[in-house]
Amino acid sequence: VQRFGAQPTDTLTLQAAPGDRLTLQFTQQNQPQTLTTNSVKLEIQMQPLSEPMLQERVVLSTHRSFESAEDSAQRWRSQGIPVEIAQPSRWQVWAKREVYNTPLLRRVLLTSLQKQGYVIPFLDSQVLKQVPQAAWIVNNTRYSNHPLQITAGKSPIQVKTGGRDPRNRSYAGQLRLQRNAYGNYTLVNQVPLETYLRGVVPHEIGQQAPQPAIEAQAILARTYALRNLRRFQIDNYQLCADTQCQVYEGLTGTYV
């Protein structure tokens, strides 16, 4: 789930298999906390801010593909401008936020580029009065600590998404709810490469494909994954689950 909290009605329900339990790990008041439960529902609350907050970045270029954005990023770096690649909707190259971390520095950069004849870079500014805050309830206690790590004892975790795009899928490995660069959250599935390929190949080629085609697709999917682990460095994960990368649906619909 790449953009949990993009809509205030977004929900996620995580369910352990019968006879299994979920373990939730997070930090509260600088102390590690562990809870166990059969299921947990994550939801979004819009959290009012005590004072308006400026969310701003210098967008140097916009692209249809990661490859095009990466080429552009290399050109900006060659001019001495630290950058990062993002995907708020389309792919973009941003001036690195850690470096251009004040309104003055961002405006100095943009003015300098305009004086050099650049017309594409622009300042993406938004004043926020509230932000999405993910929360969950276990044993009648409400929590909103992040990141949140979720594991199951021995079985896959069932994940049901609510909101505008309801789905029900099964995932091996661990799940991690973490903030992303766009002000909402990403639910990351942490699995070994072989498990990842199980969730990709049937959905890229179809479940009725002949065995030689399945084997060839597995090689292609593995090669693609290993070559593209850097795509989402800005958000602290490696690959997305849709056609911008490879379609990945966990253990749902995998080969036996």
Functional labels for PLM-detected ranges:
Residues 1-256:
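Conserved, single-site charged/polar hotspot
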